[in-house]
Amino acid sequence: CKSISAFANTLGGFLIFGISDDNQIVGLETPDKDAELISEIIKTRLNPIPEFKISFHTEDGNVLLIVQVFKGEETPYYYSGDGLLEAYVRIGNESAKASPIELKRLVLRGRNTTFDSQNSMYKVDDYAFSKLRERYKKWTGNSFDEKDLVSFGLATEDGYLTNAGALIADESPIRYSRIFCTRWNGLNKSGGTFDALDDAEYEGSVISLIDNGEAFIKRNAKMMWKKTANSREEMPEYVERSYHEALVNAIAHRDYLINGSEVHIDIYDDRLEIYSPGGMPDGSNIQERDPVTVPSTRRNPVLADVFNRLGYMERKGSGFAKILDNYAFQVNYTDEKKPYFRSDRYQFTVIMPNLNYRGTQDGTQDGTQDGTQDFDTLIMNMIEENNKISAKIMAEKLGVSLRTVRRLIKENDQIEYVGHGFSGYWKIK
């Protein structure tokens, strides 16, 4: 019955009776009586009673009993047994007791409502919406009218903000409406002498969070380029349209029921990760699915609708495809640099590789010959642009160590340094 509760509370599912523990078909001796017993147990142990269907299937003369449990609309569906009243959810292939946060979600779903559409205790008159007005004017060309707060679902007729309105307000009263941003030193959170190269914390309106989060990424991401016949090709470390989409989705679809949580932007040498509290709304794990075919599900539909009106996101819900497609369009993209997604019942993370990163061994060897040749070209481009550029600045632009740049220059017969010290200059032979 715990599995029945879990299926009804999640996406529905099937239970098959007549299969042994080692997955051998053994059948049931009295399938009709077993069906009556199972039906009775469901009706007496589950509250409310979920919609289910019992059928039989014969395989090699063995009768199997199949219980199909449908996704419920009157959640939570509680299991009553062992002196307890508990709700269960599906986590992968297992049925697990619903956490307090998951129970809150089930209650909201059973009421056909969402966190962002619920009324708050905050009065409209106590808060300003200059960020909303400014963005709305910029995107639509129209002025934002006070009555639009109600029509957008941000306020009630009697002058109170909804939770979506509280999140949009300039000085959001929702304390966990915030993002933590860190540029880590290395490939993990223990980078050596200095753990972090840059960090920032932002709170307030979700509109400000988007702007500040993107600004943090931009100031910690380098732009490389190479000359072409008539111009030059830019090669960013991270694709702006991809990380914009990931950040907007993280803020719009995060689980605001999880108190004391926040969106995280973590930049490492080789990747950018954007983490948001709360897993997939349907309880599945994104890494076990094809992200391009996942149907759009809005955990916070009011907030998502406002973001659409402000030009931050589209109604059709193509976020995963946008992140992947915009990466694939880059000239420095390879299959190894494809973004990927990871989730569990508590979190969702988008991982976007650094398109210009080349792995090193002991700081002296770059990963591939092609990578070395790319760096040689980029170094010569920088020298042609500024023949007095320092090796230190080259290293910063390339995102590699000073030692690596010096080695690459030493091994490149086409590069020569004329003169000594600061008075000297680079020359391409």
Can you describe what each PLM-predicted range is?
Residues 265, 422-429:
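Minor-groove-contacting beta-hairpin "wing" of winged helix-turn-helix DNA-binding domains
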Residues 403-406:
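Key DNA-contact positions within bacterial/archaeal DNA-binding proteins
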Residues 396:
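Alpha-helical residues within the helix-turn-helix
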Residues 90-261, 265-270, 275, 279-296, ...:
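Active-site helix-to-loop segments that bind/position phosphate- or nucleotide-bearing substrates
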